[in-house]
C-alpha cells in the first residue's frame, strides 16, 4: 500500500482518446468544436494499491496463423535461425508482454505434449480444428519464445488427458532427475525449463473434471509446492461450480475466466461503434460476479481469504471465426466443404474490422482489471497475434492494430500503484442501453509524486473537457500526454496505411 505525500501535484500523466504518458487519452475524434465535460477526483485519503503487471499478458493457440505464419515461420526471410519472426518479436517487445498462455484453448483438448519434443516429431491430426498439426512448435519453442520476450511461460494441460500425462509434462519441464528429466536432457536441454504456472484443462466442467483438477493439483504441488495452479472456473455466461472450491480449492492459486463480448464463432458480425461501446462496462460486472463467487467460498471457509486470484486468461472484444468447428472426430481434409469452412476463418484477419472500438474497449477492460486488482492478477488477451489480436502478421511484415497501441501505452506509461477515483460525467446512450462517456484510471509511482492517468472518451463525435482534482484541489504543475484517436470511429490500420491510428504527443 502507498499513501500519498503532501507534494503530490508536481506531475501528471494524461491519456486522452487512446493515449498515455502523463495523461493517456483514448478518444474517437478530436476534430469537433463541441465537447462533453467530466470531473475526475482522486481520493487522496485512501491508499493506492499495487497491481500485478501480468494483467497485460497474452495468449497463443494453435489456430489459424497465430503460431505458424505468426510468431513462428521458419521459411520466412524475416525469421531468425530458430524460425521466429524478428519483426513480430520486436513489436511484441514494445508491449513488454509479461506472460503468455499456451497451447490453448480448445486445441489443447487433443494435444499431447510428447508429440512436440525431440528430433523425431511427426504431424498429428488436430481434430478440434480440422487441420494437420506439424508439431514443429512445441514445448521448447514456446520456452524460447518466452525468453525472447522476457515473458513468464504459462502452460495449459490437456484437460481430457490422464493426470499422469500432466505430471509427466511438469517433470519433463522442471525436474532435475528422473525419466522425463533424462528425456529433456537427451533432447538437448540439460537445465530445467522452470515453468511455474500450469492450468488443468481449458473450459472444462463437471464433477469428473473437478476431481481431476484436485488430483492433478495435489500431484503438481507434491513435485513443487511453489507451482501455481489454475483451472477452468467460468467461461461465457456460466458460473463457478461450488464443488470446485469444496473438492479442489486447497490446491488452486487461480480461477480461470474467459469471455468474448462479440461472439463470432459461427456467424461473423461487425457491430457498429455505439454497439461496441455499450459492451464496454460489461467486463467490470463480469469481474465483480467472479469476485463475489470467490468471496462466498472464502466466507464458507472452503478457501483461505486471498488465496485464489482471477486469471482472466482469455478475453477480447471479438472472438475469432470458426464456422462448423470445433469438432470431435477427424475430418476429410480433401472435402471441399471442409476446405471452405477453414478458409472462412481468415475473415478474422481483415484489417478494417479492428477500429477505435477495439482500442477503447481494450482500455476499458484493462481499467476494470486495474480497479479490481486485489483479485484480478492475470489477464491474457486472446490471441496476441493474428485472428482478432492486437498484432497482424502477414508474409511481408506486420500491422499494429488499434488495440496494439492501447497496450503499448498502458505498459509503458502507467505507474505501479492504482488509486481510487470518482468520475462525474454524462452518459452515452444507444436505444435503451447506456454507459458513462468517460472511463479513467489513475496510477502513481512509488514516491507518490508522479501520476499517470488514463482517460477514455467513448463519445463518437464530441471532444472531452475534463477536470482532474486531488481531493478539493485541481491538479496542476508539469504534465505531458499522448492521445490515441482517429479521423472517425471506423479508423483502422492496414498494410498501406499502418499509422492511421497511432499515439501522438499532446
Where are these regions (language model features)?
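Bacterial Sec-dependent N-terminal signal peptides
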Residues: 1-35
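Non-catalytic accessory regions flanking glycosidase/transglycosidase catalytic cores in CAZymes
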Residues: 28-240, 245-257, 283-284, 288-321, ...
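Active-site cores of enzymes that catalyze phosphoryl transfer or operate on phosphate-rich substrates
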Residues: 251-254, 262, 273-281
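Active-site His/acidic residue clusters
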Residues: 259-275, 325-327
Amino acid at each position: 500500500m502507498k499513501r500519498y505525500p503532501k507534494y503530490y501535484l508536481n506531475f501528471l500523466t494524461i491519456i486522452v482518446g487512446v493515449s498515455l504518458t502523463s495523461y493517456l487519452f483514448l478518444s474517437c475524434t478530436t476534430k469537433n468544436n463541441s465537447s462533453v465535460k467530466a470531473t475526475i477526483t482522486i481520493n487522496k485519503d485512501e491508499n493506492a494499491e499495487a497491481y500485478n503487471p501480468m494483467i497485460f499478458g497474452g495468449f497463443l493457440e494453435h489456430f489459424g496463423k497465430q503460431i505458424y505464419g505468426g510468431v513462428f515461420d521458419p521459411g520466412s526471410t524475416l525469421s531468425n535461425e530458430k524460425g521466429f519472426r524478428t519483426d513480430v518479436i520486436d513489436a511484441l517487445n514494445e508491449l513488454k508482454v509479461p506472460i503468455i498462455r499456451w497451447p490453448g484453448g480448445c486445441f489443447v483438448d487433443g494435444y499431447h505434449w510428447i508429440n512436440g519434443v525431440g528430433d523425431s516429431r511427426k504431424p498429428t491430426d488436430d481434430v478440434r480444428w480440422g487441420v494437420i498439426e506439424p508439431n514443429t512448435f512445441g514445448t521448447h519453442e514456446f520456452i524460447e519464445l518466452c525468453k525472447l520476450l522476457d515473458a513468464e511461460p504459462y502452460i495449459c494441460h490437456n484437460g481430457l488427458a490422464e493426470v499422469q500425462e500432466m505430471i509427466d509434462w511438469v517433470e519433463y519441464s522442471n525436474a532435475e532427475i528422473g525419466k522425463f528429466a533424462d528425456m529433456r536432457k537427451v533432447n538437448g536441454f540439460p537445465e530445467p525449463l522452470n515453468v511455474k504456472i500450469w492450468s488443468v484443462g481449458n473450459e472444462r466442467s463437471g464433477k469428473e473434471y473437478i476431481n481431476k483438477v484436485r488430483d492433478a493439483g495435489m500431484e503438481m504441488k507434491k513435485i513443487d509446492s511453489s507451482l501455481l495452479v489454475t483451472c477452468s472456473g467460468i467461461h461465457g455466461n456460466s458460473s463457478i461450480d461450488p464443488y470446485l472450491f469444496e473438492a479442489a480449492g486447497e490446491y488452486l492459486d487461480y480461477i480461470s475466466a474467459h469471455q468474448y463480448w462479440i461472439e463470432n464463432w459461427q456467424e461473423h458480425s461487425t457491430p457498429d461503434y455505439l454497439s461496441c461501446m455499450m459492451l464496454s462496462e460489461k467486463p467490470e460486472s463480469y469481474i465483480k460476479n467472479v469476485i463475489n463467487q470467490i468471496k462466498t467460498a472464502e466466507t464458507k471457509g472452503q478457501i483461505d481469504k486471498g488465496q485464489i486470484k482471477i486469471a482472466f486468461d482469455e478475453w477480447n472484444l471479438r472472438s475469432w471465426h470458426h464456422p462448423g468447428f470445433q469438432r470431435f472426430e477427424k475430418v476429410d481434409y480433401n472435402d471441399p466443404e471442409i476446405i471452405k469452412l477453414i478458409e472462412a476463418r481468415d475473415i478474422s484477419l481483415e484489417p478494417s474490422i479492428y477500429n477505435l472500438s477495439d482500442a477503447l474497449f481494450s482500455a476499458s477492460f484493462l481499467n476494470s482489471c486495474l480497479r479490481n486488482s486485489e483479485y484480478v492478477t492475470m489477464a491474457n488477451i486472446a490471441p496476441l497475434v493474428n485472428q482478432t489480436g492486437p498484432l497482424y502478421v502477414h508474409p511481408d511484415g506486420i500491422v499494429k492494430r488499434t488495440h496494439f497501441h492501447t497496450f503499448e501505452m498502458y505498459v509503458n506509461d502507467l505507474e505501479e500503484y492504482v488509486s481510487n477515483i470518482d468520475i462525474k460525467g454524462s452518459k452515452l446512450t444507444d436505444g435503451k442501453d447506456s454507459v458513462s462517456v468517460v472511463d479513467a484510471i489513475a496510477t502513481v509511482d512509488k514516491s507518490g509524486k508522479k501520476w499517470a492517468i488514463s482517460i477514455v472518451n467513448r463519445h463518437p463525435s464530441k471532444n472531452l473537457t475534463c477536470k482532474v482534482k486531488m481531493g478539493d484541489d485541481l491538479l496542476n504543475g508539469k504534465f505531458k500526454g499522448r492521445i490515441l484517436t482517429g479521423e472517425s470511429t471506423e479508423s483502422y490500420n492496414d498494410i498501406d496505411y499502418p499509422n492511421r491510428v497511432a499515439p501522438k504527443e499532446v
